[in-house]
């Protein structure tokens, strides 16, 4: 009986090791974990060519978060993307990762009523802003997010007026600070605020302001919140 238990434990242990050795996050982390702080800063700046980084991400993003974002944004090519990024350090790395199915494009999940793991939040927000600007009927999942826009209209009416004046004067919101306090509702309130402005400033400018303002960590937290509903 004792012998059987040991065999079973060994099988479980070997299985866990196999999962860890084939998990893309773990494979990519092996290449990042020994980088110096200066080297990692170079990696972050090079990553901005492939990932949506907010202003705060350049100083606060961790290696784990960066890896998770690369895997999520490029599930079939995360190894190639990391290899390209590492060229900024004059390092030629070889990352062998088995690819998986590509995530669903936002245009296909418009009929879904719940957020899923394979949906990118950036895709969701970009398409949502476009739907609002172009007055396209919203599916169930987008209707949930649209409640944040309604809330923003009631909560930030004065601030929205000032933002519109700023845009009409300068033609952009590049140096405009969103009047959204940083708390657990920061991401959803930012989405709601920018959604109200989307018909005025255009969905592209609204989306890039969202990326500039909301960090990857905050986006990931919000995605988990959406998935839990």
From Swiss-Prot:
Induction: Expressed in the early phase of the viral replicative cycle.
InterPro entries in UniProt: Orthopox_C1, Poxvirus_Bcl-2-like
Pfam families: Poxv_Bcl-2-like
The entry's keywords: Early protein
Top-level taxon: Viruses
Keyword field contains Oxidoreductase: no
Keyword Chaperone appears in the UniProt entry: no
Stretches of the chain forming a coiled coil according to its record: none
Similarity remark: Belongs to the orthopoxvirus OPG034 family.
The name this protein goes by in its record: Protein OPG034
Organism ancestry: Viruses, Varidnaviria, Bamfordvirae, Nucleocytoviricota, Pokkesviricetes
């Amino acid at each position: 009986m004792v012998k059987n238990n040991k065999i079973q434990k060994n099988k479980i242990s070997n299985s866990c090791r196999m999962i860890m050795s084939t998990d893309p996050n773990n494979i990519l982390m092996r290449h990042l974990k020994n980088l110096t702080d200066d080297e990692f800063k170079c990696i972050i700046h090079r990553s901005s060519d492939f990932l949506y980084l907010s202003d705060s991400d350049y100083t606060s993003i961790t290696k784990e978060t960066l890896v998770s974002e690369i895997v999520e944004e490029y599930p079939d090519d995360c190894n190639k993307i990391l290899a390209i990024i590492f060229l900024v350090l004059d390092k030629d790395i070889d990352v062998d990762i088995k690819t998986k199915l590509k995530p669903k494009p936002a245009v296909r999940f418009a009929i879904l009523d719940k957020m899923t793991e394979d949906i990118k939040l950036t895709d969701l927000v970009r398409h949502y802003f476009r739907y609002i600007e172009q007055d396209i009927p919203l599916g169930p999942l987008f209707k949930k997010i649209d409640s944040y826009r309604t809330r923003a209209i009631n909560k930030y009416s004065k601030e929205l007026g000032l933002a519109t004046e700023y845009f009409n004067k300068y033609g952009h919101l590049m140096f405009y600070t969103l009047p959204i306090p940083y708390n657990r509702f920061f991401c959803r309130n930012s989405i709601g605020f920018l959604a109200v402005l989307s018909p005025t400033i255009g969905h592209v400018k609204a989306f890039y302001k969202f990326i500039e303002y909301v960090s990857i960590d905050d986006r990931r937290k919000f995605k988990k919140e959406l998935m839990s509903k």
